[in-house]
Amino acid sequence: GYSINSRTAFQYLSDHQGIDQDFSPRSIYFARQDMKQKMFSEELNIKSTTPGRYKWLFGAFGFWQGIDNTVTLDYFTKDYATRKLYDTPAYGVAFYHQSTIDDLLTRGLSLTFGIRYDYEHTSNDFLFYKETDGGSEQMDAFDSRLKFSQVTPKIALQYMFPSTGMLYATVTKGYKTGGFNTSFDREEDRTFRPETSWNYEFGAKHPFLDNRLNAEFC
């Protein structure tokens, strides 16, 4: 048999900040940031429920996110203000699978293998205005797009002792996608790169005092 699970989520954020940028008793610079963020996500997976040595799981994940950010900087001593508008929508999908084989070669030893594929597309529509009593002047503008994809594997070994306790070892690849910063001053700070890591974990778990104390070493 099998079971199907679904998880749907929606997030909404409305943030307003006012910051005294000159940090002095005088009114010289004052920054205002207004940001609205909306995100919708859906995850669906199906996994085996039939008793046996082999267990499997397949899943898919998708999301859409929209961020609208406006940063206004008032220059009181110069009688003008700057206004930066950042429109940063993004969407992504992921597909994953995991298989586990129990009692591999010997009773109590299990092997788990997993793999995941991620794809994400993000864009940034940026407008920069200088505002005075005489009106508004556009100083800069761009519309950029970025695409990212990555495959991340996982492998784990676990041995359950006949009495109590277990040993385990896990190797996984971690991934964090790149994208656009929600605000920036320099051109080189407009985007950030993806990050990857390899993670290794070795450990043991064992109960003591008739299961009243559990110890874990890793």
Regions found by a protein language model. Name each.
Residues G1, I19, P25-S41, R83-A90, ...:
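Outer-membrane beta-barrel proteins
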Residues G1, M35-N45, A90-Y96, S110, ...:
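Transmembrane beta-barrel architecture of outer-membrane proteins
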Residues G1-L57, F63-Q65, N214:
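Outer-membrane beta-barrel domain signature, strongest for Gram-negative TonB-dependent receptors
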Residues Y2-I4, L44, G52-W56, R107-L111, ...:
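Outer-envelope beta-barrel architecture signal
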Residues S3-D22, M160, G165-K176, T191-C218:
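Membrane-embedded beta-barrel scaffold of Gram-negative outer-membrane proteins
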Residues Q11, D20-Y29, T72-A81, L127-E137, ...:
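Flexible, surface-exposed loop regions and adjacent strand-edge segments
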Residues K38, I46-T49, S99-D103, S149, ...:
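Residue-level signature of outer-membrane beta-barrel architecture
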Residues L57, G62-P162:
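Signature of Gram-negative outer-membrane beta-barrel scaffolds
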